[in-house]
Amino acid sequence: MTKTLYITAHPHDERASYSMAAGKAFIESYKEAHPDDEVIHLDLYRENIPQIDADVFSGWGKLQSGSGFEQLSEHEKAKVGRLNELSEQFIAGDKYVFVTPLWNFSFPPVMKAYFDAVAVAGKTFKYTEQGPIGLLTDKKALHIQARGGYYSEGQAAELEMGHRYISIMMQFFGVPEFEGLFIEGHNAEPDKAEEIKQNAIVRAKELGRTF
């Protein structure tokens, strides 16, 4: 059974967010076209996504020194254990769908925290004499991103770092197929906002059938 992780990083739902509206249209279409697939929704604003902090570094250090997991403090066990759960879940996925807004040229901080959780040497990539090699070579990924302005071309394209970051991480993990669905210009041209939204929903539904 194909397992798809639907990973959203937005505090709003589809009623207030263009990216979430497109994401909802995509995943509903995807489920209809792939009824036997397992879809797991990770709402990063509601999930427990530990940041890499002093407890995590301390816990990792103890484990690397030979201590057993039960010898960690309660805080260390909770955070290190949860990070392991997230990385194992990510590895078990076959397809990844990331849904984010473009905020200050990137995505919400919780998205970065999630990538920190799943970027684990020996799991999603490994180090070799020739450099790091991605281990997720049989996966595919999609990024749905809403941008109030226009960032697909021109000088503004150089400022966009959200999609570029996810693209870099997918390459780093060895994911061979990665594409983006962008909704842009609704703030720059508010009179066209509804048209932009509906066009994005149509494209999302089409992509959901073939992804």
UniProtKB/Swiss-Prot annotation:
Catalysed reactions, as listed in the record: 2 a quinone + NADH + H(+) = 2 a 1,4-benzosemiquinone + NAD(+); N,N-dimethyl-1,4-phenylenediamine + anthranilate + 2 NAD(+) = 2-(4-dimethylaminophenyl)diazenylbenzoate + 2 NADH + 2 H(+)
Reported cofactor(s): FMN
Any GO MF annotation of the entry: oxidoreductase activity, acting on NAD(P)H as acceptor
Binding-site residues for FMN, renumbered to this chain: S17, Y18, S19
Entry's EC annotation: 1.6.5.-, 1.7.1.17
Entry note: cofactor: Binds 1 FMN per subunit.
Assembly and oligomerization: Homodimer.
PANTHER family: FMN-DEPENDENT NADH-AZOREDUCTASE 1 (PTHR43741), FMN-DEPENDENT NADH:QUINONE OXIDOREDUCTASE (PTHR43741:SF7)
Its biological purpose: Quinone reductase that provides resistance to thiol-specific stress caused by electrophilic quinones.
Stored HAMAP family: Azoreductase_type1 (MF_01216)
Record's protein name: FMN-dependent NADH:quinone oxidoreductase 2
Gene name for this UniProt entry: azoR2
